[in-house]
Regions:
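Nucleotide-activated sugar donor-binding and catalytic core shared by glycosyltransferases
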Residues: 1-405
Length: 405
């Protein structure tokens, strides 16, 4: 039976991967400040469990990526979703919060909302980039959407959906003023040399498409800038092995890159410019206040299908450029982005070298990044998890019939 939401609510959270576990852990802490006697249940990882969360299933059950892998595990995932929905309907928590993982969570949320439970979706899918009509499905699934980016709530508002910007948690974890000197000391990189950080992707499949192109581009820049230091952080041991093979064929020992185990944040901070694959890493580079050149390729078939079905809603892809437009910094590209057929070693090298040699341009980019960092923190006091907890607490204090609309 539902608990008294004003005293000891039963709050269900469903996190599907490592990033969701971190968001969930921060959210549990923030909600517990408001509801010390609350009980937290659902699916979560080690970080959430350390906060007193009761996980009914192993979070790794949901950690599948890529179309082929999802298809292979689909029967198991459907069985898990059915069991989870049944248990949540039996327990009837005061609110159910799906954290990211939209392919799994939205179906769960929709079934529960239809049954009269309050539902929240934390982390909006990228409706600003492609398939905006997904907002309507999300609205059928969630009473409230908690957004990490300021351009997202207006999109939902067009569809009559309650969405709140709560700030981006990464914006809380990155300092507003970056420490290049400290980062170079940590990596034992001299303070007086130009440094290029190269991040060609964190997944083996990305490296297979981009690794050779990015390292060839870096080598071209090194040939044009004697004394350049190149640092490449490896996201995990498998990626390190792939990068080691690529670096092994570099040839010129003097300009050979420094390959790191992890330490992507330090590598970005130490750099003058970052050459990286499009994705979350571009947001991290922006919050590190590092000018960047962004490149990416998907398979030609995937790209043609997306174009043919008009699934892409934007003509820019790098998050800093999308945010710059959304926050009123104009339509010009803040950072160079080279996508698909334009993502060649020659083009990446040319854009990177131009940025390395233009200190005035780099200063302009850094100033814009400082502004965007503040925008992602939002105008309210406190951290993103606190804003998210406030939005959930407000829903908890609303009668269920009203919350369901």
């Amino acid at each position: 039976m539902p608990t008294n939401a004003r005293q000891a609510p039963l709050i269900a959270l469903i996190a599907g991967e490592d990033s969701g576990d971190q968001l969930g852990a921060d959210l549990v802490s923030a909600l517990r400040k408001r509801y010390p006697d609350a009980r937290f249940v659902g699916i979560g990882g080690a970080r959430m469990q350390l906060k007193g969360f009761e996980s009914w299933y192993d979070i790794r059950e949901l950690s599948v990526m890529g179309f082929a892998e999802v298809v292979r595990h689909l029967p198991r995932l459907l069985k898990l979703r059915k069991a989870l929905v049944a248990r949540l309907l039996a327990e009837r928590p005061d609110v159910v919060v799906g954290i990211d993982a939209p392919d799994f969570n939205l179906g769960v949320e929709q079934r529960l909302k239809q049954a009269g439970l309050r539902t929240v979706h934390y982390v909006s899918p990228s409706v600003w980039a492609w398939r905006e009509k997904r907002a309507e499905k999300i609205g059928r699934s969630a009473d409230r959407v908690l957004c990490l980016f300021p351009m997202e709530p207006p999109i939902y508002a067009k569809h009559g959906i309650d969405a709140r910007f709560v700030g981006h948690p990464l914006a809380d974890r990155f300092a507003l003023v970056s420490d290049r000197v400290g980062a170079r000391d940590v990596l034992n990189v001299p303070q007086n040399v130009p440094v290029l950080a190269v991040l060609p992707g964190s997944r083996p499949s990305e490296l297979a498409r981009l690794g050779t192109i990015f390292l060839d581009a870096a080598k071209r820049v090194a040939q044009a800038m004697p004394g350049l230091r190149i640092i490449i952080p490896a996201a995990n041991p498998r990626v390190h092995e792939q990068l080691q093979t690529l670096v092994g064929s570099w040839g010129d020992v003097e300009s050979a890159p420094l390959l790191l185990d992890g330490k992507a944040h330090e590598a970005m901070l130490a750099a003058d410019v970052v050459l990286l694959a499009s994705g979350t890493a571009t947001l991290e580079a922006m919050l590190s206040k590092r000018p960047m050149v962004v490149g990416y390729r998907v398979s030609p078939t995937s790209y043609r299908i997306a174009r043919a079905l008009n699934m892409l809603k934007t003509d820019v892809y790098a998050l800093p450029n999308i945010l710059a437009r959304a926050c009123g910094l104009g339509n010009d590209l803040l950072v160079p982005e080279l996508m698909q057929d334009d993502c060649t070693a020659a083009n990446l090298a040319s854009a990177t070298l131009a940025l390395m040699q233009d200190s005035e341009r780099r200063g302009h980019v850094v100033a814009a990044f400082e502004f965007l960092h503040q925008q992602l923190r939002g105008q309210l006091e406190g951290e993103a998890a606190d804003h998210a907890a406030d939005a959930i607490a407000e829903l908890l204090e609303t009668p269920a019939a009203t919350a369901a609309g």
